[in-house]
């Protein structure tokens, strides 16, 4: 079930409260020291469902700044599923660790920046980005699928490593 209001989220963790408080600032919200967290670092955990709600907006959520969502150093828990979501501002999740693949199939975004992050896959078939997709120094232990993606900016993979899943592994 998708969250529709902030009330649906329930009790917010400290990193979530901090991000919510800075949502309309246009600046980066930094979890901890902003470096890449270890898996299971609950002090820096932010739920993917909460991020989705912030990106899509809700009546009881502060307005997202025009620069988009800017987060550094979080452990993103759960599946951040933005499939078919349109007109999203920029998404910056730098030096973040994801425990599930990021799903952007048929999404429409301004830009995507995942620099320094670690994730188990990126499903972005038919993604439409007005700007670039920046994956500098990213570690992906799984598939990257950008088939049919339309990028008005650059695709940057400098310093990244991808360990593709075996062909017997089902797609995300």
Regions picked out by a protein language model, each given a short descriptive name:
Residues 1-172:
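N-terminal leader/targeting and pre-domain segments
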């Amino acid at each position: 079930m998708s969250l529709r209001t902030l009330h649906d989220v329930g009790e917010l963790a400290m990193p979530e409260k901090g991000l919510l408080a800075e949502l309309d600032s246009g600046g980066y919200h930094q979890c901890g020291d902003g470096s890449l967290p270890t898996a299971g670092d609950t002090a820096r955990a932010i739920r993917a469902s909460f991020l989705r709600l912030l990106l899509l907006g809700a009546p009881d959520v502060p307005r997202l700044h025009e620069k988009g969502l800017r987060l550094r150093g979080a452990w993103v828990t759960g599946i951040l599923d933005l499939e078919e979501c349109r007109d999203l501002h920029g998404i910056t999740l730098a030096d973040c660790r994801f425990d599930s693949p990021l799903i952007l199939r048929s999404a429409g975004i301004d830009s995507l920046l995942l620099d320094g992050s670690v994730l188990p896959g990126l499903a972005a078939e038919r993604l439409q980005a007005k700007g670039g997709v920046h994956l500098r120094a990213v570690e992906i232990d799984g598939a990257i699928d950008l088939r049919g993606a339309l990028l008005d900016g650059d695709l940057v993979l400098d310093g990244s490593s991808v360990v593709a899943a075996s062909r017997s592994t089902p797609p995300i």
